[in-house]
Swiss-Prot record:
Coiled coil: none
Binding site for Fe cation 1: H21, H57, E61, D120
The name this protein goes by in its record: Bacteriohemerythrin
Keyword presence, Chaperone: no
Pfam families: Hemerythrin
Listed Gene3D superfamilies: Hemerythrin-like
Family that this chain belongs to: Belongs to the hemerythrin family.
SUPFAM superfamilies: Hemerythrin-like (SSF47188)
Alphabetical keyword list: Iron, Metal-binding, Oxygen transport, Transport
Superkingdom of the source species: Bacteria
Length: 153
């Protein structure tokens, strides 16, 4: 498997999410490089980093969805939980001495791109709207400022 290449159709239009997704792609590519060098310690480090970063990315993404009132946020969170379980199983197998590199890279690349194009695409409008409302609210002085103007002129 060659390095994964970011494609424009993976962009959600939410810069912070796109940057996090690109970072995950970089980590998958680091896994490939470590595996090519047959560096067990480097592979272990990349797997741990991937799991940790993905967990924090999912938590961030889930918070954005919940804050936006995205109606399928609970189902989306379940998808994340199932994925983390699968990746954790690979981590355990690797720690037990099994060579799971190719299998894990295949899962990660297929799952990530499919997830972004299908599952993540579903929340984009709600989150972008929510974020624009926050920016608008802030530019208008926020709730307190508007309330003070309304009550005290």
């Amino acid at each position: 498997m060659a390095h994964l290449v970011w494609q424009d159709d993976l962009n959600t239009g939410i810069q912070v999410i796109d940057n996090q997704h690109k970072r995950i792609v970089e980590m998958i590519n680091h896994l490939h490089d470590a595996q090519q060098g047959k560096e067990h310690a480097a592979i272990a480090e990349v797997i741990e980093e991937l799991v940790d970063y993905t967990l924090s990315h999912f938590a961030f993404e889930e918070t954005l969805m919940e804050d936006a009132g995205y109606q399928f946020s609970r189902a989306h969170k379940k998808i994340h939980e199932l994925f983390i379980r699968r990746v954790s199983e690979y981590r355990v197998r690797f720690q037990a001495g099994e060579d799971v590199g190719d299998e894990l890279k295949g899962l990660l690349s297929r799952w990530l791109f499919n997830h972004i194009r299908n599952d993540d695409a579903g929340y984009v409008d709600a989150v972008r709207h929510s974020m624009s409302e926050l920016v608008k609210d802030k530019s208008e002085g926020g709730w307190l400022s508007r309330s003070m103007k309304r009550f005290f002129g």
